[in-house]
């Protein structure tokens, strides 16, 4: 059984007060329309048609690389007119119609609407809400059958009391659309061609109207302004947090937790407040994430502790390692088992060996550090010569004293010691002590300058 999909995305969204179309506002780091497209793609439709209008190039660019046909609605004359523009690009089969600004709609709800709507039926997704203000109302006859959909601006006082609303999501065969769409008239307050008029045509043609409802009310909520966008963001994040907690993870405050990508979790993890997940992140078992941390495209293995105010990006933190507080692990780092990236330590493109420690105030860039090394406070691997990056290699059991600079390319041998305050420009052999600093002198004849006092 084939399926075509039409996504309406021509609106300007003036209440957003933005230079972007409304459907390109973001929720959980994805545009609104990307959320909708992702949901319908799981239905495996034969084709997806997106009707664009305001700033159409931006919408097309945002969806580049997907199997989508774009149709331009030059004049925004209403939803019925928008679907009419898409009609030539649809196959002779059922058509699912929905909006590009309903980001929380689930594949399951759409699938239920499609599956329960026969080829000769009209399927309508409706919902019961406590506050229907601004939404089209579902009008039923005394037998409970749907007779029409009335937009709020065209509704009378009795109709405005109705709590059942139109979600704007329909399923109908192309043959019926070909018959009904040209018959729509703009005889309403807005002087627009409303897609909702197909309900009236269905009744006149004795077409059965199949009504389904969403699993959760929030799934059908649209976005018209930034306040609504912020509210939906919290709904989305709360829903994600609850799914994660159901897998055996404790979250200190689900209202202060953001997933802006995909999070794969083990059991018995603890996530403190204001943690942000970006891209693809995987947590092992018994992981502790402190407050105000940002994790992006990384793997955190079992029993790792990421202390507060730390960032891990594009790296892997091995079992039992500790990061933070106030640490930054940049892309292409591999922090081995039991290693420590301490407070105010930054690492980039670095391997920190098993059991090695850089406990505080250190920069490790383009480095390969062996096992059980000690990197003292204030150590810098100077990897950049102004043109190219160079590598620092430190062998197992090496000890790098505080406030030392290692000028790459340089190798520190296994078991070697670098004295505090040294600037190392040559390789240090294994088990050697390297000291590079001026000899301390005491000058007993020296006198401190004295400031002259005013007479």
Swiss-Prot record:
It comes from the Bacteria. In the N-terminal section; belongs to the N-acetylglucosamine-1-phosphate uridyltransferase family. In the C-terminal section; belongs to the transferase hexapeptide repeat family. PROSITE patterns: HEXAPEP_TRANSFERASES. This is Bifunctional protein GlmU. It catalyses: alpha-D-glucosamine 1-phosphate + acetyl-CoA = N-acetyl-alpha-D-glucosamine 1-phosphate + CoA + H(+); N-acetyl-alpha-D-glucosamine 1-phosphate + UTP + H(+) = UDP-N-acetyl-alpha-D-glucosamine + diphosphate. Its main location: cytoplasm. NCBIfam families: glmU. It is an enzyme of class 2 (transferase). One of its GO terms (cellular component) is membrane. Residues 227-247 are annotated as: Linker. Pfam families: Hexapep, NTP_transf_3. The active site is at 360 (proton acceptor). Catalyzes the last two sequential reactions in the de novo biosynthetic pathway for UDP-N-acetylglucosamine (UDP-GlcNAc). The C-terminal domain catalyzes the transfer of acetyl group from acetyl coenzyme A to glucosamine-1-phosphate (GlcN-1-P) to produce N-acetylglucosamine-1-phosphate (GlcNAc-1-P), which is converted into UDP-GlcNAc by the transfer of uridine 5-monophosphate (from uridine 5-triphosphate), a reaction catalyzed by the N-terminal domain. It comes from Francisella tularensis subsp. holarctica (strain LVS). Its EC number is 2.7.7.23, 2.3.1.157. Residues 1-226 are annotated as: Pyrophosphorylase. Binds 1 Mg(2+) ion per subunit. UDP-N-acetyl-alpha-D-glucosamine binds at residues 8-11, 22, 73, 78-79, 99-101, 136, 151, 166, 224, 330, 348, 363, 374. Acetyl-CoA binds at residues 377, 383-384, 402, 420, 437.
